[in-house]
């Protein structure tokens, strides 16, 4: 594939993603908090700091991996980096493969560090990159963490995608053992299972982003790029973010879990934190805001999102993220069926 074709693909991904709409039905709507009328705390008591063994985020919300690798996406990364700088959010760039192949493309990613020199930035590579390239991706952005995206459904629907996956787990193990910053194994909208969590724990993984279905749909994106558009029947493939978080429950004491995929509102973010996530990521909402409304409007959107999270936590009488994990939740019969059929041990305060 030529550099021009790769740039074109990056732009196509963004164009199709922006045209997608939120799923009409979300598993976040299938779980409810129990309301108690009189809180014992004030809004100013709320501490939204997200603390993991290696990373401290001011807020448990981050701009998730999206793009880079073309002039248009450079402009997007530049604007998102300014939003991150002005709001204190962490930010992940999209796959840096384009920059690792062609130094001319490096600036489409490094612009994020240039615009946000003191901020928390995650670099991003695929599960098949050599260890040396993973190290290079971290150095490229002076990144505080490295996301490794695992995206087999996307690759298989992508006309020019990868068809070989046997080496992925061993390669991830090698990267985890060599890279000095936290390595986050990140799905891309298809969710995670307890079996995967077991496999990742065995090779020393300490961070995952479950990225469940319901947000940006890479099966749909790649199917749009197919000549016959003949794989749309896979559109609903995978686990939702709620199901994925429930799948991780037994591993949350050993692995820091981040949640993304279909988060629409501050309430969805709070529900994710209540299910054990340490932080929540969003891609398309930030992309649409910054492209359609500009930087200032997106900064205001983030500030409002954070304030709404504080209001919800006050209603729940939860001073911090840890408190949220003890709050009572009522699940729908469908989610309870998933828990039962998957033999998940869900214990709450």
UniProtKB/Swiss-Prot annotation:
Binding-site residues, substrate: 9-10, 95-97, 154
Full protein name: Isopentenyl-diphosphate delta-isomerase
Lineage of the organism: Bacteria, Bacillati, Bacillota, Bacilli, Bacillales
Annotated Gene3D superfamilies: Aldolase class I
Positions annotated to bind FMN: 65-67, 95, 124, 186, 211, 216, 262-264, 283-284
Location relative to the cell: Cytoplasm
Molecular function, one GO term: FMN binding
Recorded catalytic activity of this chain's protein: isopentenyl diphosphate = dimethylallyl diphosphate
PANTHER family: ISOPENTENYL-DIPHOSPHATE DELTA-ISOMERASE (PTHR43665:SF1)
